[in-house]
């Protein structure tokens, strides 16, 4: 519609094609991917929230993440993080239940050695029983602050959690949902695959506390600037 009306157009997406299906269903998917590519070609700009090299009308602005509310030490005191914190999130749905259960299973054997505490954010749909083995935060609206304050993040390979972990310098273990192409592709960027869940204890020991430098967090500002140029 915008094309026919001669309006300026910007598409913001982190997926330029899908690979969910096989067999006959893949024929429909290929047509949808072709339609997506056609839409991209008719836009003035396609904004992708990843790190990459611009080409044609595609602009890579870097991760779009929320600004943390305080410095890391202040956040840890405010939240009550004293030990080495392993933050586990299931991504807000039951899909992450298997990952949370695995983290609960392996942590007791590591707790004394790592002086660690298991903090779980299962989200709104998954109910966990009370236990001395972990601290259950349920659903939170400041996940980005928790990620920044933690010493390790264990999560499904969801875009926002991975981007925030990378931007804030917090090490992460990202296990994709099996046969979910987008999550498998995202996890592979960090060197992980589904089978890594079976060596979770080893990965926790390897990754915890290995912080990296915080990254440029101006993806949203770059996207806004591109959009404003067309107004």
Which residue stretches match the model-derived regions?
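Nucleotide-activated sugar donor-binding and catalytic core shared by glycosyltransferases
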Residues: 1-117, 125-231
């Amino acid at each position: 519609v915008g094309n026919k009306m001669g309006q300026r157009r910007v598409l913001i997406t982190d997926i330029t094609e899908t690979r969910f299906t096989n067999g006959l269903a893949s024929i429909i998917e290929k047509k949808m991917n072709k339609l997506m590519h056609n839409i991209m070609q008719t836009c003035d700009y396609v904004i992708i929230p990843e790190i990459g090299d611009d080409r044609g009308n595609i602009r890579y602005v870097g991760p779009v993440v929320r600004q943390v509310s305080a410095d890391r030490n202040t956040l840890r005191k405010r939240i009550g993080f004293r030990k080495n914190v392993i933050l586990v999130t299931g991504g807000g749905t039951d899909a992450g239940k298997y990952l949370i259960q695995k983290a609960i299973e392996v942590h007791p054997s590591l707790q004394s050695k790592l002086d660690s505490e298991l903090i779980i954010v299962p989200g709104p749909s998954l109910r966990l029983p009370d236990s001395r083995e972990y601290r259950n935060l349920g659903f939170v609206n400041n996940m980005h602050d928790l990620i920044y304050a933690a010493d390790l993040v264990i999560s499904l390979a969801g875009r926002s959690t991975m981007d925030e972990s990378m931007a804030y310098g917090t090490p992460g273990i990202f296990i994709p949902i099996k046969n979910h192409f987008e999550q498998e592709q995202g996890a592979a960027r960090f060197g992980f695959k589904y089978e890594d869940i079976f060596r979770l204890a080893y990965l926790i020991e390897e990754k915890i506390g290995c912080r990296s430098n915080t990254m440029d967090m101006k993806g949203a500002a770059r996207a806004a600037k591109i959009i404003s140029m067309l107004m």
